[in-house]
Amino acid sequence: MDRRTFLQSSALFSAGAFLSPPLAFAAPADFPLVRVPAAKRNFQSQAVELAITEFKKKVKDRELAWLFENCFPSTLDTTVTFKMAGNKPDTYVITGDIDAMWLRDSSAQVWPYLKFLKQDEPLRKLVAGVINRQTQYVLKDPYANAFYDDSTKKGEWSTDRTDMQPGVHERKWEIDSLCYPIRLAYHYWQATGDAAPFDAQWQQAVKNTLRTFKEQQRKTGLGPYRFQRDTPHATDTLPMSGYGYPVKAVGLICSSFRPSDDATLYSFLVPSNFFAVVSLRQAAGMMEKLAGDQQTAQELRALAREVEQALKEHAIIDHPKHGKIYAYEVDGFGSFNLMDDANVPSLLSLPYLGAVEAADPVYRNTRKYVLSENNPFFFKGSAAEGIGGPHVGHDMVWPMSITMRALTSDDDQEIKACINLLKNTHGGTGFMHESFHKDDPKKFTRAWFAWANTLFGELLWKTYQEKPQLLV
């Protein structure tokens, strides 16, 4: 896409928020110390500290340097607890303000540190510990999305009508909860060559994942999972006795909930099925090379091919304005839900996850759609524009969506505009948040949300490495 076409088509540059001078309240007059003091940090990485020092020295924008120092190490500073369990590393990772470990969040929170593992042995052990802990959780319950450190604890959702066990914080079935640990494991292996975490227990966890995905294709019935909660929020429970609305068995995998932890409308969640295709193939390669398990590898690849073909047949619809685009959810009967949500996997994030090429014509059309006001969860205000979702509600933009917009862009102006927007909307706190009001960044949710912080740090470091001129 040439620059003229981009400027004409992108909502980004049609929004005054991106072209106007920085908002007066966007940044504090100076940049006070808001990072946790060194003595109180949960974990310190020499390699990450060197990266922070380099960024602060080379990047002349003082506010971006300040934000990078605060956000990039947020996961290490505040959310990880590392120990050796016997002779194996073991790492518990909370989300921030919620003392529970999500399989998704914990994977995403440590993801940007993978490139530093060869330089930092303690950091490598920390990430290996995350993989080991995730393995134990998948073995415990592959349908659960979040767990406690204490395996005997019963929490606030213990009365949910599903097969809750002690130690499980929440049991919302989300495809991506099983994809993220594979993504982390595969890229850890690629980055380090270390096969120690991928023992018989890890291999069994992969088999649990394969079995669960097949169960949720619902070819022979509704499967073993159901979920109901007594709640005033329709997005926190499932209709029809806890199974969700009917789907036609076409080869796709059901996801009862989205990565936002909101219930799906149609259970074939398209971004998560794309993610599953990638993860199944990564797991197949590992089972083949590390375990010599050709049978499981073949089954994983066969399922990946089946889901991939079903996506081609059922996930693409004709939009009257944008042409062929990916639906967010489908049911196999012909019904579809057009939207996108800020949480990853999203339609916007598909190239970031390695699920589609950024140049794919259907993705390009989809990108235009989700970043337009045709997407019911794209909000544009006087302070910002970006994707939100039903989890927080109307008019609340998620910084994660702005970060992901930049991470999936090949246009320098768009990347720079997104970075500037994030710089101008931290509400004076020095950190990213779950969401903020489109007209007032000081009205935000979740002051301590490590995933959003670390993801923003990933964007800044990537931009510094590849296109430092955009940080000026």
Stretches found by the model and what they are:
Residues 5-26:
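N-terminal export signals
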Residues 12, 27-104:
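Low-complexity, Ser/Thr/Pro/Gly-enriched N-terminal "stalk/linker" regions
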Residues 47-60, 108-121, 180-195, 274-292, ...:
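Well-ordered alpha-helical scaffold segments within catalytic/enzyme domains
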Residues 67, 122-137, 195-214, 283, ...:
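Extended, well-ordered alpha-helical scaffold segments
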Residues 76-89, 152-161, 246-258, 428-434:
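Active-site-adjacent bridging/hinge elements
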Residues 99-127, 131-235, 450-466:
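Aromatic-rich carbohydrate-recognition surfaces in CAZymes
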Residues 103, 138-143, 147-150, 156, ...:
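Extended ligand-binding clefts on enzyme/binding-domain cores
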Residues 161-166, 171-174, 337-357, 395-472:
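C-terminal capping/lid segments that line or modulate ligand- or cofactor-binding pockets
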